[in-house]
């Protein structure tokens, strides 16, 4: 018989840097899950990734206090900032204050958008790479990036 699911926890955790402090500890603790077990398993799975890359994770909590987790691709904004060369670190660079109106914060090519779309395809809610490129193009514009051919 399958285990009974008691809930889901969605978090965005830096690769290789899961620890019991907030937001992980309180989110898992209130469901009665073993926080250190998750941290060790997550850090082991993300050991080969670039340290600090934000990884969206969905944790499924079961009635017997066990859990499973599924990792997604990093957010589109992370890939866009990386492609353009905006600072990614302790204090991430923000996009334009007035997207589409004021000065742009960088330029991105259609080829770079397609590359990002192919990476993100499993996580996006679209059927074709062209539709994924259109979604990512919209995110780029909203961040204040200029899309060039």
UniProtKB/Swiss-Prot annotation:
One of its GO terms (cellular component) is cytosolic large ribosomal subunit. CDD domains: Ribosomal_L11. Gene3D superfamilies: Ribosomal protein L11, C-terminal domain, Ribosomal protein L11/L12, N-terminal domain. One of its GO terms (molecular function) is structural constituent of ribosome. One or more lysine residues are methylated. Keywords: Methylation, Ribonucleoprotein, Ribosomal protein, RNA-binding, rRNA-binding. GO terms for biological process: translation. Belongs to the universal ribosomal protein uL11 family. PANTHER family: 60S RIBOSOMAL PROTEIN L12, LARGE RIBOSOMAL SUBUNIT PROTEIN UL11M. Forms part of the ribosomal stalk which helps the ribosome interact with GTP-bound translation factors. Part of the ribosomal stalk of the 50S ribosomal subunit. Interacts with L10 and the large rRNA to form the base of the stalk. L10 forms an elongated spine to which L12 dimers bind in a sequential fashion forming a multimeric L10(L12)X complex. HAMAP family: Ribosomal_uL11 (MF_00736). This is Large ribosomal subunit protein uL11.
């Amino acid at each position: 018989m399958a285990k009974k699911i008691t809930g889901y926890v969605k978090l965005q955790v830096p690769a290789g840097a899961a620890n019991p402090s907030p937001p992980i500890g309180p989110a898992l603790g209130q469901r009665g899950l073993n926080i250190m077990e998750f941290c060790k398993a997550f850090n082991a799975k993300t050991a080969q990734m670039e340290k600090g890359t934000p990884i969206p994770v969905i944790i499924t909590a079961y009635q017997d206090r066990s859990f499973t987790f599924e990792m997604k691709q990093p957010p589109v904004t992370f890939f866009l900032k990386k492609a353009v060369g905006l600072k990614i670190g302790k204090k991430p660079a923000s996009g334009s204050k007035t997207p589409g109106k004021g000065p742009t914060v960088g330029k991105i090519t259609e080829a770079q958008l397609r590359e990002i779309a192919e990476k993100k395809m499993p996580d996006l809610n679209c059927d074709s790479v062209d539709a994924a490129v259109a979604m990512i193009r919209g995110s780029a514009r909203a961040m204040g990036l200029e899309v060039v051919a």
